[in-house]
UniProtKB/Swiss-Prot annotation:
The chain crosses the membrane at residues 27-47, 90-110, 127-147, 199-219, 222-242, 259-279. It comes from Methanoculleus marisnigri (strain ATCC 35101 / DSM 1498 / JR1). It comes from the Archaea. Pathway: Membrane lipid metabolism; glycerophospholipid metabolism. This is Digeranylgeranylglyceryl phosphate synthase.
């Protein structure tokens, strides 16, 4: 067992970005950053890392074929060692969360449970798996806001809702892209049940919901600059979802770049919220 393997199995880039996102959530809720708020980044990074490790534990047989270089199939970390490591990361994140607020602690515990349930059962469950991923993405902003109390959490509801709905749209379109591979792997996704076309319609409806959520005046950032900036973001999100709306085949969805456009729209929304919060 090497130190580098224990770092690599956490997907550190993913964990660090999640941690920084929590800080941005606090910034949006309060308009500033404080030294204690750095705890948020550490907590989210640890819990995200734990989720990534438990995912590798559950996917070990698939990784033996598709990703034999991953730490567990490569023999760099044992299954027992990975399970213990994941538990330590979750416990560490929750323990640090006790130093924050009751709201933050509750979200940390709930998200840890969802990450485990997702890896064990929801990952290959149609729609519910997509909803779990979307909730986890949006809840990071609620977690950041919750460090400022219930008022901070409420201020971040719009961004959390945008992220939740846009992520569902993107996850569904990603599933539509991967129908052939998922079928070969024995997965069961929404596009495999209702077809690519109906999945695109549902994804577009979720994108419209994200646009509606962006207009909700929950924070002090709501004003002329925000409305001008979010209008552009909304167009990007709608354009991305619309690109996938007319598709009837996985190849069409891939060629539409709908998922990439939606991801760009989500990052742009985050930038608009952050800038509006500090000006």
């Amino acid at each position: 067992m090497s130190v580098s393997a224990f770092i690599r199995i956490t997907r550190p880039h993913n964990a660090v970005v999640a941690g920084l996102t929590a800080l941005i959530g606090y910034l949006i809720a309060t308009g500033t950053l404080t030294p204690p708020s750095l705890l948020l980044a550490v907590i989210v990074a640890l819990i995200t890392a734990g989720g990534n490790v438990i995912n590798d534990v559950r996917d070990v047989e698939i990784d033996r074929i598709n990703r034999p270089d991953r730490p567990i199939p490569a023999g760099d970390i044992s299954l027992a060692g990975a399970r213990a490591y994941a538990a330590a990361l979750f416990v560490g994140g929750i323990a640090i969360a006790t130093l924050t607020t009751t709201l933050c602690l509750a979200i940390a515990i709930i998200n840890s449970v969802i990450l485990i349930v997702y890896a064990v059962r929801l990952k290959r469950t149609p729609v519910l798996g997509n909803v779990a991923v979307a909730y986890l993405a949006g809840s990071v902003f609620l977690f950041g806001g919750a460090f400022a109390g219930i008022e901070g959490l409420v201020r971040n509801l719009s961004l959390a809702a945008i992220t939740f709905l846009a992520t569902i749209a993107r996850e569904l379109l990603k599933d539509a892209e991967d129908v052939d591979g998922d079928a070969a792997g024995g997965a069961r996704t929404l596009p495999m049940i209702v077809g690519v076309r109906k999945t695109g319609i549902f994804a577009f409806a979720c994108a419209c919901g994200a646009v509606a959520a962006s207009l909700l005046p929950f924070g002090d950032w709501w004003g002329l600059f925000y409305l001008a900036g979010i209008a552009v973001v909304d167009l990007v999100i709608l354009f991305g979802a619309f690109r996938g709306l007319s598709c009837t085949t996985p190849g069409c969805v891939r060629e539409s770049n709908a998922t990439s456009i939606l991801r760009a729209g989500m990052f742009a929304a985050l930038a608009v919220f952050a800038i509006a919060a500090v000006i």
